[in-house]
Amino acid sequence: MIKETSRELITKLNGFEINQTKDLVIRGQKYTFNVYRIPISNLNYNVKNGRISTWMQSNGEKIKDKSTTEINNIIEEAIYSENKDQMDKTMRDIEENGQMIPGVVLSNGVVIDGNRRFTCIRRLKRFTGKIDSDYFNAVILDEEISKNENDIKRIEYNLQFAAEERKDYNPVDKMYDLYHQVIETKNFTLDEYCAATKMKKSDAETFLEAAIVTKEFLDYIGCDKWDYAKKVNIHGHMDEIAKHLKYFKNKEPNIYEMMKLIMFNMEIVKPKKDVGKYVRNLTNNFKKAKEDSKEKFLQEQEEINEKIKPIINDDSLSYDEKIAKIENYDDEDLAIEMYNSVQTLSYVVETQDMNVSKKMDNIFQLLKEVDEDSVPFLPQRDLISLKNTTRCLEDKIERIKNKLNEYEKDSNQH
């Protein structure tokens, strides 16, 4: 049985009851709690919150050795900066209509639900000085609940995934929380996590696979901070990469690690902006390719990897510095090199059942569509690519001509 909030606890937080209640589901049962107005000076942010804990991974040094007041100010600014337009809109709404939706706080004054509203009220207090902005309306949980981290998490999830305002919760924050709770700390089994967050198990499994691949990617680039995944917005790519790596793990396990390396390098080099689509095309073509074409492609990718690997393994460089160095690799364009390798595989698959004559005719028809007058107007990157491709074409045509000459010479001798 969950106890009512004690008078002693209410007094400790200087709260006073208002004519409002809030329902919470705790340990599978629904309870109705009174709501209290609590001075914001008695409340603090929850550093174990999913969104805040992701931010903390990259910014923990900012709050090291800081006072509670300073920590609150730093986290407030981080929450506000993440989506200023939405926060300003919420601030205007609270200023005009008051705080309509109460939050939830622990017995020690830590806010576990309502971080955005708490942030808006703190900022309104500072910028408007209105008396109403001195208080945050919230349920106060008793000490028994406040000391049980799994109970707290379940309450957070119940509120987080049910509320309309949480639909824009960043996917990387969700992904990190799932990975942290199920894989790292094992606080929840996947089934328990699904029950707490109301996620379909199939969706959670897909999400967890993407989270595991994201962690592997971060390890690969030497970055232990999930916040970076949010910064570069890789969630959608990792979702796609995880799906296709699953195919190789199940169907072609002997090249699984190599394909993972190739896809991670694609995420780094970005031969095309839509990495997810690019990975999808690669997998589809690789499935159809003949063994000699697969081996040639893997060899090309291994050569690209040999250029990337020393940079990625250089611990003296930040991730951004690694990217800059890869982009300017000895005047070569690794993105173009990777793009050409994948496009070649695609073309080989498309024409692998044609004989040499038909392939050459097909190439000639494509070349007829090329507008040579547009060459001077190409961007520098495309000019470099065109020059490399033209040189490769010349070499290939020369080899074909030599074979034709050999054939004609042999025919004449006979």
Question: Model-predicted segments: where are they?
Answer:
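Short, charged/polar connector segments at secondary-structure boundaries
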Residues: 1-132
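An acidic, glycine-rich, mixed-charge low-complexity segment common to nucleic-acid enzymes
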Residues: 1-23, 34, 380-414
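Amphipathic, charge-rich alpha-helical segments that serve as recognition/docking helices
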Residues: 78-79, 132-215
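Structural motif corresponding to the C-terminal cap of alpha-helices
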Residues: 98, 182, 371-374
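Amphipathic alpha-helical "recognition" segments
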Residues: 129-136, 201-271, 278
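Charged, long alpha-helical assembly modules
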Residues: 236-330, 334
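Charged/polar low-complexity intrinsically disordered segments, enriched in acidic residues
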Residues: 306-391
